[in-house]
Design a protein with these regions (language model features):
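Flexible, compositionally biased loop and terminal segments
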Residues: 1-270
Length: 270
């Protein structure tokens, strides 16, 4: 039996939400039907993350390379994104969630920005959890942009070449404003990173799930976090040096969630 413990939670979880198209194809439906079901999985996952007490959740919603998909699919995705933001606005604001977005946001259509930008502003003082949507996003592109900003600063004389450090570069990377990811989950059965949070992934734990994203449920998130908590994170050291294990202690198991489903979980069996 595995357990999730509140005291050993990853601070920042990233999810590569893969499998919407295959989910639809398996049912003989258009790909957009899978994306629509995927939006419901986002809602479930955000609720579960908040219930667990996660500090930050980053969802890979649309990559820079996804613009090359058929125009009809891209248009449907943008419309669905707008609908999702509108439908989730009250839940975000009422539950202390700060909405963030990273990526080449200038490429997003006006119909999305008209909803996304005000909601980011309205929620910026919320502190229960930060929900980051990676939109028109690429990890390599993010690193290049960060390096370019430092190069400009050196050229302008604002900093010296020796001031260009790993931390200086990291400070220019928007996706890491909530910290490096501790755990990255990929659904859909593939075993790759797909240009996601590349700079911050140095010591992240990776979890690959076969479940397609539209079927991703609370139990799947809990299972991924239970796996994370059972690992020893060494950060390049040997185990005796790090003293950093995520494994839970041997307390009595809890077989069900608290009666108040919105309350943070202390310990739950999965």
């Amino acid at each position: 039996m595995n357990f999730v413990e509140a005291r050993n939670l990853p601070g920042h979880v990233g999810i590569i939400m893969d499998g919407n198209g295959r989910w639809a194809q398996l049912r003989g439906e258009p790909r957009v039907a899978g994306h629509r079901e995927g939006a419901l999985a986002v809602r479930r996952t955000v609720r579960a993350a908040r219930r667990l007490g996660l500090r930050a959740l980053t969802l890979y919603a649309f990559s820079e390379q996804n613009w090359a998909r058929p125009e009809e699919e891209v248009d449907a995705l943008m419309q669905l994104l707008r609908e999702f933001l509108l439908s989730e606005k009250d839940e975000i604001l009422d539950n202390g969630i700060r909405l963030n977005a990273v990526g080449n946001l200038g490429r997003l259509p006006a119909l999305v920005r008209a909803v996304l930008d005000p909601l980011r502003y309205e929620s910026e003082q919320n502190h229960q959890m930060t929900l980051t949507l990676a939109l028109s996003y690429g990890g390599r592109e993010e690193i290049v942009n960060a390096a370019r900003e430092l190069a400009k600063a050196v050229a302008a004389g604002r900093i010296r070449p020796e001031d260009v450090t790993a931390e200086a570069l990291r400070a220019q990377i928007p996706s890491l404003s909530v910290g490096d990811p501790d755990l990255v989950i990929r659904t859909g059965g593939e075993r790759r990173i797909s240009n996601f949070l590349l700079y911050g992934l140095a010591y992240a734990e990776l979890y690959f799930a076969d479940v397609l994203w539209p079927d991703f449920a609370e139990k799947d998130l809990f299972g991924a976090i239970a796996s994370f908590q059972a690992r020893e994170r060494r950060f390049g050291l040997v185990g005796s040096q790090s003293g950093n294990t995520c494994a839970p202690d041997a307390a009595a198991p809890v077989d069900s969630a608290p009666a108040d489903a919105s309350a943070p979980i202390a310990r739950i069996a999965v």
